[in-house]
């Protein structure tokens, strides 16, 4: 499956313009000296963060990007114009890697950050530059330097304060739709969410935070199983994680075993992920048998000092308390002091 969070493109900076071989041609000056101008510099390739972008879709549609070539030098000591600079706009959070080696070239995590990815070639010198006392009429000039070219891979890591994770179909999309403006596709089958989506949650006193609905994970995700490690990377920059459990399938499915399986995948992919703050959220608490099943799993989490919030994405039960806890973890102060 394909997601607009990763793209491979070819980028090339501009070639430098050639220097000119020219001699003065003026009336009454039969032996005019060299007057060939220099070639223009090739255009650089610059990558810059734009606050107006949220995907890499445009680059996927235009995989070949090229800066302008420098113009050739001209007679009468006229220099060629520099090639136009190519400015590639990307969303905040884009990581740029060499497509062949995997080397990280840039991590554009800050707003308005930018970098020169490739330098344009220098323009060649015209023959006027090579005139000496012993060589007054040079009939040669320098060619322009070629620009640089490389294949790069861009990866967009979602910038979110809170990440939702859990097995497929535990209710992550329903929760984010309930508490934010996001409207992810929702249905009763696995892997409904085929790409990560962001929702802005408006909290009290005009405060807000961003929540990422990460598609359902399964065992083996760290090795690419299911929708694979392409989703795990989106959790790396979230400040905290909400781990959703669905108790409605007990005893056919073991929610504690699923919880442990996902945490193993987090640790295998990146040990720091397993250390992130996690809050366990039990969805569908409006169903009577889920309330009964909650009593069975609570001791496991209480022994480990892990908070459990029973909520219902359908009715809204428990959601205000959950949002208060998220806000406290994000901003570290009680709501009354804001």
From Swiss-Prot:
- Which parts of the sequence belong to the OBG-type G domain? 160-331
Q: Which residues bind Mg(2+)?
A: 173, 193
What are the GO MF terms of this UniProt record? GTP binding; GTPase activity; magnesium ion binding
GO terms for biological process? ribosome biogenesis
Top-rank EC class of the record's enzyme: hydrolase
Instruction: List UniProt keywords, sorted A-Z.
Output: Cytoplasm, GTP-binding, Hydrolase, Magnesium, Metal-binding, Nucleotide-binding
Residues annotated for GTP binding in this entry: 166-173, 191-195, 213-216, 283-286, 312-314
- Specify the Obg domain's residue ranges: 1-159
EC number(s) per entry? 3.6.5.-
Region annotation Disordered: where it falls in the sequence: 58-79
- Supply the CDD domains for this chain: Obg
GO (cellular component) term, any one: cytoplasm
**Where does this one sit in the cell?**
Cytoplasm
Against InterPro entries, the record matches this protein to: G_OBG, GTP-bd, GTP-bd_Obg/CgtA, GTP1-OBG_CS, GTP1_OBG_dom, GTP1_OBG_dom_sf, OBG_GTPase, P-loop_NTPase
One Pfam entry name: GTP1_OBG
Function text: An essential GTPase which binds GTP, GDP and possibly (p)ppGpp with moderate affinity, with high nucleotide exchange rates and a fairly low GTP hydrolysis rate. Plays a role in control of the cell cycle, stress response, ribosome biogenesis and in those bacteria that undergo differentiation, in morphogenesis control.
Which family does the UniProt entry place this protein in?
Belongs to the TRAFAC class OBG-HflX-like GTPase superfamily. OBG GTPase family.
In its UniProt entry, what is this protein called?
GTPase Obg
Organism of this sequence? Citrifermentans bemidjiense (strain ATCC BAA-1014 / DSM 16622 / JCM 12645 / Bem)
Q: What is the lineage of its organism?
A: Bacteria, Pseudomonadati, Thermodesulfobacteriota, Desulfuromonadia, Geobacterales
